[in-house]
């Protein structure tokens, strides 16, 4: 229903009577002032007008400020968006707000992973302890194969335990606080394992003889078969014979044999024994001038296929040195080089004992006499050095300088015999001549096992073979460098000693330098059937550098391809 205006006015009067009274009072006052002070009416209206304008201007000024602030804010936000990536700006806050449940789940997963890894570590440690206390695994009838497998298992377990601990450290690092102490008894256990550790030579178990020769009794060494490595092995056996027969050993002349004093220190042998047990040929000749310079008795260890393994040409060389040979070549027993019999100390003393001043025995390289004694670390003779026959001081120092320059401490040495080895190996069963790709696989396995950084290559192989071998020796996707001794370079000083003493171009010095470097390696890979390799193994055994990872190339394998016979 509509209401008229009078009703509205009545309601208004009832609702706000105070306002109405003030209005009426103000109107009465204005009216009275206008009546009594007519001249001042204009002035009063001017003041009201001024106040009204001031208020109006204030409102305008305030509005301008709001506009300026608003525009500035818009510009600032625009610049912020232009100069930064909005996603990066709000990523941290939004992600922390939205992904907090996921973050909690990640933490729970990490802690769960830590628990599982700890359980794995305990299980591996249990396996590890079981391998250590079960020596029967190393004493099985399949000695070689089972021992290698056993060592590989132990190495793998050790690596897994180390990896396990590393993973735990990574997962645990975000959860650590300043007062965290999460160590356990397991962490304090030393489970490190060196797969290619040094071999315990058990020197206390050596069986030796004393070498105390009579100063007027001599044994002339005859070593003719093979090259320098054969002769050095022969010379070591001659020392054993001289010790058993109480004689001074005469080192052969370079006109009849190799020049031994260039590669080994002869006088050092006397120092190791503490007495004169060996004498150079020239010294022997000076002593013999007082008497008749001759060989009183020439005894042959082998009777076939040729007495003493000596031909007429070598007899002429001996006589050319001014030595006369009384009597004929004789053999105390029937002995074939191809099938040598096992002989004892008593056999030698009985068959080779003589009252003659000078006797010669040859050739004893193939002699199979007390091999257990001969193959001991340091040999069968009691002395105070590590070994009696070792490289000269010049060669030792040069080898050390080469290793410091090119190889470092942890390196593998490889004797890779190729020249003339194909026919030699194929005459054996099984053959020992391996195709390059197969050889590379065998080498890579040893590198992986030993963690060697570089390989020193001692070889007579052609460049075509060594280049292919280099490209194929790959471990973990990386080619393992093969290092050979470089040609002479005046800027390099590692070989300065050899040049200073004028022996840099001697092939036997080079060969002995190669042997020395190989003998000092962390791990050695040799060539089966090579006496060069055997002499390196002798040095490693005597020096205590032999490793449990030392082995012949591709040991236990046959070549995957063998050529037919001629």
Curated annotation (Swiss-Prot):
Record's protein name: O-fucosyltransferase 36
CDD domains hit by this protein: O-FucT_like
Ranges for the region named Disordered are 1-37
InterPro entries recorded = OFUT2-like
E.C. number:
2.4.1.-
Topology in the lipid bilayer: Single-pass type II membrane protein
Q: Which source organism?
A: Arabidopsis thaliana (Mouse-ear cress)
Q: Does the keyword Transmembrane apply?
A: yes
- Family, as annotated: Belongs to the glycosyltransferase GT106 family.
């Amino acid at each position: 229903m509509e209401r008229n205006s009078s009703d509205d006015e009545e309601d208004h009067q009832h609702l706000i009577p105070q306002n109405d009274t003030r209005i009426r009072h103000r109107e009465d006052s204005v009216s009275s002032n206008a009546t009594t002070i007519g001249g001042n009416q204009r002035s009063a209206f001017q003041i009201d007008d001024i106040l009204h304008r001031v208020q109006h201007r204030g409102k305008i000024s305030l509005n301008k400020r709001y506009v300026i602030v608003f525009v500035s804010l818009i510009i600032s936000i625009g610049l912020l968006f232009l100069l930064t990536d909005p996603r990066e700006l709000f990523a941290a806050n939004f992600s922390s707000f939205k992904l907090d449940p996921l973050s909690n789940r990640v933490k729970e997963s990490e802690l769960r992973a830590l628990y599982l890894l700890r359980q794995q570590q305990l299980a591996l440690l249990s396996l590890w302890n079981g391998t250590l206390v079960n020596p029967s695994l190393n004493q099985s009838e399949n000695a070689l194969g089972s021992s290698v497998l056993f060592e590989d298992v132990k190495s793998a377990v050790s690596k897994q335990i180390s990896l396990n601990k590393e993973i735990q450290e990574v997962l645990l690092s975000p959860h650590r606080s300043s007062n965290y102490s999460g160590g356990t008894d397991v962490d304090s256990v030393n489970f490190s394992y060196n797969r290619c550790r040094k071999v315990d030579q058990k020197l206390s178990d050596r069986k030796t003889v004393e070498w105390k020769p009579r100063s007027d009794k001599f044994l002339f060494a005859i070593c003719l078969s093979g090259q320098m490595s054969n002769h050095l092995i022969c010379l070591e056996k001659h020392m054993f014979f001289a010790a058993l027969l109480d004689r001074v050993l005469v080192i052969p002349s370079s006109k009849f044999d190799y020049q031994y004093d260039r590669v080994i220190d002869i006088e050092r042998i006397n120092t190791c024994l503490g007495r004169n047990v060996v004498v150079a040929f020239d010294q022997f000749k000076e002593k013999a001038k007082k008497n008749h310079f001759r060989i009183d008795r020439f005894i042959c260890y082998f009777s076939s296929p040729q007495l003493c393994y000596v031909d007429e040409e070598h007899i002429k060389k001996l006589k050319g040195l001014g030595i006369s040979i009384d009597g004929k070549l004789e053999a105390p027993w029937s002995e074939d080089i191809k099938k040598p019999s096992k002989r004892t100390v008593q056999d030698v003393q009985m068959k080779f004992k003589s009252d003659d001043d000078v006797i010669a025995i040859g050739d004893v390289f193939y002699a199979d006499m007390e091999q257990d004694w001969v193959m001991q670390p340091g040999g069968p003779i009691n002395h105070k050095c590590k070994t009696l026959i070792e490289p000269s001081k010049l060669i030792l120092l040069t080898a050390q300088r080469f290793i410091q320059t090119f190889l470092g401490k942890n390196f593998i040495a490889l004797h890779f015999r190729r020249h003339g080895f194909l026919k030699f190996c194929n005459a054996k069963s099984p053959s020992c001549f391996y195709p390059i790709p197969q050889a590379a696989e065998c080498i890579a396995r040893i590198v992986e096992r030993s963690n060697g950084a570089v390989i020193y290559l001692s070889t007579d192989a052609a460049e075509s073979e060594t280049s292919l071998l280099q490209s194929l020796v790959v471990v973990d996707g990386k080619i393992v460098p093969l290092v050979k001794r470089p040609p002479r370079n005046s800027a390099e000083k590692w070989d300065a000693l050899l040049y200073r003493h004028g022996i840099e171009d001697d092939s036997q010095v080079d060969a002995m330098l190669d042997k020395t470097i190989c003998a000092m390696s962390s791990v050695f890979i040799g060539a089966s059937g090579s006496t060069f390799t055997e002499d390196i193994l002798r040095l490693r055994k005597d020096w205590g550098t032999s490793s449990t990872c030392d082995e012949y190339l591709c040991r236990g394998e046959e070549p995957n391809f063998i050529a037919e016979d001629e």
